[in-house]
Amino acid sequence: EKGLSFKDNFFDRIIAIHVLEHLPNLPVTIKESSRVLKENGLFQVVIPCEGSLAYSFARKISAERIFKKKYKMDYDWFIKSEHINKPDEIFEELSKFFKIKKKYYFPIPLPFEFCNLCIGMNLELKT
């Protein structure tokens, strides 16, 4: 999240899989990623469909259930402190420097967040 020690246009590809939703200073990370990515480079991102019906249900029957059983604590405070950036916020920040080349939805290949768990994107720098 701080300035990276790489020169401008250094990387052919940057990969951020289940990372961007956790970063407290998302705008700086996105800006730095755009600075160090080569002009024809690829920024590959995967984010959870946080808040969607499918994601919420999947969490209830998996991570939340396991967390509550193991720690005997409420799960909401934990996940809210971990997933601080929602998909709309991430899309907004990405759109300042990148354009979406391709978008993938998982597990249902329909362009709707409510029925999916994750969104994958191939992005390129705006020209």
Spans of model-derived segments:
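A short acidic, Gly/Pro-enriched loop at the edge of an enzyme's catalytic core
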Residues: K2-I14
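Conserved short-loop catalytic and cofactor-binding motifs
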Residues: K2, I17, Y75-F78
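Short, well-ordered turn and helix-capping elements at secondary-structure junctions
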Residues: E1-K2, P107
